[in-house]
Design a protein with these regions (language model features):
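Non-catalytic, glycine-rich low-complexity segments
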Residues: 2-57, 63-69, 120-125, 487-490
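Short, hydrophobic beta-strand segments
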Residues: 32-34, 89-96, 559-560
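Aromatic- and carboxylate-lined catalytic core of secreted/periplasmic carbohydrate-active enzymes
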Residues: 39, 402-404, 413-546, 560-574
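Active-site mouth of glycoside hydrolases
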Residues: 48, 108-112, 126-376
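A generic structural motif
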Residues: 52-54, 108, 144, 533-537, ...
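Solvent-exposed beta-strand/loop surfaces of large extracellular or lumenal domains
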Residues: 57-82, 536-555
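Extended acidic/polar, glycine-enriched regions
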Residues: 66-138
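Extracellular glycoside hydrolase catalytic/binding regions
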Residues: 290, 297, 311-453, 514-516
C-alpha cells in the first residue's frame, strides 16, 4: 500500500491506499473505514461516499464510492461471500495525468454530510498512454484511444459464461468459460467482446429472489466481475457492458424472462404488475440510477470497458416507445454525470430502423443483423445509409446466420467478419453464438479452429487509415467491377486502396467454392509508383506482390484467380 491516513473526527476514520504505486492510466484503489453510519449503502439518498479529487491540470472530478465484501473461491472456481467478512467502502479511479492530486472523501447520510477526510497522492508517469476509447474526433466514423491511436474492434459476443440451466435460470458462479474464450481470442488478435450484467444468471445483479434496491446478496457476482475485468486487461479485450436485456421486461414476448424478474410483483421483492412500467415508474427510475451508480463506481475505472450499453434490443420490451426514449435520455445524462471516466454510451435494437438507436445522445449506432443469404450485402447497405445520414460510427454488435438457433457455419462467420470490417463500419460484425463457436472445429482436432479467422482480419485492419479525410467507401458500382459473381467492398484514398473481393454466391446455402477468374475493376489514384499486394484472408499472408506505375490517375486491376474471397492492398511507394 502507498499510504494510510486517519481522521480524528466524524464518521470516516481512515483511508488506506491499496495500490502499491499509483500510476497514470492505471487503477488507483482506496479503502475507507466508516463507523456509525446508518442507511442503505446502495441508495445514495440514504447513505453514500463521494470521492472528489483535483488533478494536476486543475480540473475537479467527483466519483462515487461503493460497498465491497470479501469472497471465497473454492477449488472449482465458485465465488461465494465470506460469512466472516464485513462490508467495507472502496473507491476506484484511473488518474489520467502524472503529478500531484488532492482528494477528499465525504460521507452523506440522508443527504446530510456527516464525515470527511482529505488527503494528497501522486501519480507516476504512465507506461501506457493510450487512454480510454472514444469516437475518432475528425471524421467520426471510427474509434480511437485518447492519444489518437485508432482502435478497430475485432471479436465476438461473450455475454455470459458457464452453461445455463434455462429452467431455473441459473449457471455456475465461475469464470472458466470467459477465461478460456478470452485467452483464445487474444492468441488470434481479437480485442472486443460484449457482456450482459442484467441476466438472472451468471453476472446478473437481478435474480428472481434479489432485492431491486440492495445488491448485498450478489456481491459475490460483483467480485467475479472484478476478476473478469482483470482477465480482460490481461488479454487486451475491450468489452461492452450491457445494463439490461429485453427479456427482463416483456411478458410473453421474445426471450421473455418476466417470471424470473426481480421487479415482478409476483416475486419476493418485486412491485411491478406490468413489465412496461419499468420505464415510467418513479421507484424503478430511482433504482435504475442506483444500479448504474454502483456499476460505474466499481468498474468505471477500467479502460477495458469499451462502452456502456443501456439496453439489449430494447424494442422487444413492453415499454411505450416514447417512454423508452425518455428513459434513455435520462439514464444517459445520469451516466455521463456520474462516471468520472470518458466511456461511450449506446443502446441496441433487433430492428435496424428502430429510431432510438440513431438518437444523437449516443456515441455510435449499434445494429444487430442476422440471416443468410444476403447478410454481407445487408451489412454493407445498412452501414452505408446509417453513416451518411447520421455521421457517427456504426457497429454490428450482433450478427449470425440465425438469430434463434445455435448454428455454426464457417462461411457465415468469415464473411460477417470481413463485411463488417470493409463495409464502412470500423469493426468486424460480431458473432453471437460464442459457446458453440468455442467448440466448433469443422471436423478437425484443432481447438482453435474458429478463432484463427480473427488474426488475418486484425492484420489487414491495421493497414487502413481510418482517420484519412480523403478516404471514401467503395463498392462494385464505383469500381466498375465486371464479374457477375464477384463483389467488392473497401476503401479508396488519394494514394491507396484496401479492398475485399468476394464471391457473392458463396454462402451457407451454396458452400461449394467456385474458381473466380477474369475479374476486372477500375481505381482512380494519384500518379506514381505503387505496390500491389494480394492477401489471403484465411492464412493472413500476402501471396502475391507486384509493382506498377500509375499514369493519368487511373488503373485497371485484374485480381488473380481465387475462390471464396481475397483482399487487396495497393499503396503508393513514391
Amino acid at each position: 500500500m502507498c499510504f494510510t491516513k486517519t481522521a480524528d473526527n466524524g464518521k470516516i476514520k481512515k483511508i488506506v491506499c491499496l495500490t502499491e504505486k499509483i500510476t497514470a492510466y492505471k487503477l488507483a484503489e482506496f479503502e475507507i473505514t466508516v463507523e456509525g453510519a446508518v442507511g442503505n449503502a446502495f441508495d445514495p439518498d440514504s447513505l453514500r461516499l463521494d470521492f472528489t479529487y483535483s488533478s494536476p491540470d486543475g480540473k475537479t472530478h467527483t466519483h462515487p464510492c461503493f460497498i465491497y465484501r470479501k469472497v471465497n473461491i473454492d477449488e472449482n472456481g465458485v465465488y461465494t461471500l465470506d460469512p466472516a467478512a464485513e462490508p467495507v467502502w472502496r473507491a476506484r479511479i484511473t488518474p489520467t495525468l502524472h503529478g500531484k492530486y488532492s482528494g477528499e472523501i465525504a460521507l452523506f447520510e440522508n443527504n446530510a454530510e456527516t464525515g470527511k477526510i482529505s488527503f494528497d497522492f501522486a501519480a507516476a508517469e504512465a507506461e501506457d498512454t493510450r487512454g480510454f476509447i472514444g469516437v475518432e474526433k475528425s471524421l467520426h466514423k471510427a474509434f480511437q484511444f485518447e492519444n489518437g491511436e485508432i482502435f478497430t474492434p475485432i471479436g465476438q459476443n461473450v455475454c455470459w459464461g458457464e452453461k445455463i440451466n434455462w429452467k431455473e435460470r441459473t449457471s455456475p458462479e465461475t469464470l472458466d468459460m470467459h477465461r478460456r474464450i478470452f485467452e483464445k481470442m487474444h492468441m488470434f488478435k481479437a480485442n472486443w467482446s460484449r457482456i450482459w450484467l442484467s441476466a438472472e444468471w451468471d453476472l446478473g445483479f437481478f435474480g428472481k429472489n434479489s432485492r431491486t434496491d440492495d445488491f448485498s446478496s450478489v456481491l459475490n457476482r460483483a467480485a467475479r466481475l472484478d476478476d473478469l475485468m482483470k482477465i480482460m486487461e490481461e488479454n487486451e479485450i475491450y468489452s461492452v457492458m450491457v445494463f439490461y436485456y429485453h427479456g427482463m421486461f416483456n411478458d410473453g414476448g421474445a426471450n421473455t424472462a418476466w417470471e424470473y424478474n426481480a421487479f415482478n410483483a409476483k416475486n419476493p421483492h418485486g412491485y411491478l404488475e406490468n413489465p412496461g412500467d419499468f420505464f415510467t415508474n418513479p421507484r424503478c427510475i430511482k433504482e435504475a440510477k442506483q444500479y448504474l451508480r454502483y456499476i460505474t463506481a466499481r468498474y468505471g475505472y477500467s479502460r477495458n470497458i469499451f462502452t456502456w450499453e443501456l439496453f439489449n434490443e430494447v424494442n422487444f420490451t413492453d415499454g411505450d416507445p416514447d417512454d423508452i426514449r425518455a428513459w434513455h435520455h435520462e439514464m444517459t445524462e445520469f451516466l455521463r454525470k456520474t462516471d468520472a471516466h470518458p466511456h461511450m454510451v449506446t443502446t441496441s435494437s433487433s430492428v435496424n430502423r428502430y429510431p432510438l438507436i440513431f438518437d444523437d445522445i449516443f456515441d455510435y449506432i449499434n445494429m444487430h443483423r442476422y440471416g443468410d443469404p444476403g447478410n454481407v450485402k445487408m451489412i454493407a447497405h445498412e452501414a452505408y445509409l446509417a453513416f451518411h445520414d447520421f455521421d457517427r460510427p456504426i457497429m454490428m454488435e450482433e450478427s449470425g446466420y440465425d438469430a434463434y438457433h445455435p448454428f455454426t457455419h464457417y462461411v457465415a462467420r468469415h464473411c460477417q467478419l470481413w463485411a463488417g470490417l470493409m463495409a464502412n463500419t470500423p469493426a468486424t460484425a460480431m458473432e453471437w453464438f460464442w459457446e458453440e463457436w468455442d467448440l466448433y472445429t469443422n471436423g478437425t482436432d484443432d481447438i482453435y479452429y474458429s478463432y484463427r479467422d480473427f488474426a488475418p482480419a486484425a492484420d489487414f485492419a491495421e493497414l487502413i487509415p481510418r482517420a484519412d479525410p480523403h478516404q471514401r467507401f467503395v463498392s462494385r458500382e464505383r469500381l466498375a467491377l465486371n464479374h457477375p459473381r464477384a463483389d467488392v467492398l473497401g476503401y479508396n484514398g488519394a494514394d491507396y486502396a484496401y479492398l475485399w473481393i468476394y464471391d457473392s454466391c458463396y454462402t451457407v446455402k451454396n458452400p461449394e467454392p467456385v474458381k473466380i477468374t477474369d475479374v476486372t475493376m477500375e481505381l482512380f489514384l494519384e500518379n506514381g509508383e505503387y505496390l500491389i499486394r494480394w492477401f489471403d484472408t484465411y492464412t493472413g499472408t500476402f501471396f502475391k506482390t507486384e509493382r506498377t506505375e500509375i499514369k493519368g490517375r487511373f488503373i485497371r486491376i485484374t485480381p488473380p484467380e481465387f475462390t471464396k474471397d481475397i483482399a487487396l492492398a495497393i499503396e503508393k511507394i513514391k
